[in-house]
């Protein structure tokens, strides 16, 4: 059985939208914010709110009704790159509806983070964003 991938790319500055994002879940101009102030992205068939604080990356997961969705059986990772160094961080379920991971050091301004996510049902996807540029 072939895996299907959803790839979204977010650029910073004036609204620049990759074709895959424009065709999937367009939210109008700018960035849609989640209930905790993080960027909302569609990935692997769920809505993900991405939060970065210090060394911690948190992904809060929501269903189509924007209700918290169980992350039981989810796996994920985050590739953090600042142009000079790269670090891969494992994202593990934390509580009922989140995944978390920590980098070795603070995430630099201008860093790009690529989130890879696999649901319990086997859906996979990835999204890239720059947390400090919003």
Label for each model-derived stretch:
Residues 1-5:
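Bacterial Sec-dependent N-terminal signal peptides
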Residues 7-8, 13-134:
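Intrinsically disordered, low-complexity terminal tails/loops enriched in metal-binding residues
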């Amino acid at each position: 059985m072939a895996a299907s991938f959803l790839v979204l790319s977010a650029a910073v500055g004036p609204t620049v939208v990759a074709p895959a994002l424009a065709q999937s879940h367009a939210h109008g101009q700018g960035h849609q914010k989640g209930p905790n102030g993080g960027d909302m992205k569609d990935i692997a068939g769920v809505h993900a709110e991405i939060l970065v604080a210090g060394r911690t990356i948190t992904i809060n997961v929501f269903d189509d009704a924007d209700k918290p969705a169980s992350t039981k059986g989810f796996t994920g990772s985050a590739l953090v790159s600042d142009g000079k160094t790269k670090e891969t961080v494992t994202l593990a379920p934390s509580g009922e509806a989140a995944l978390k991971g920590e980098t070795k050091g603070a995430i630099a301004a201008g860093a790009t983070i690529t989130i890879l996510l696999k649901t319990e049902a086997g859906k996979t996807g990835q999204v890239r964003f720059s947390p400090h540029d919003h």
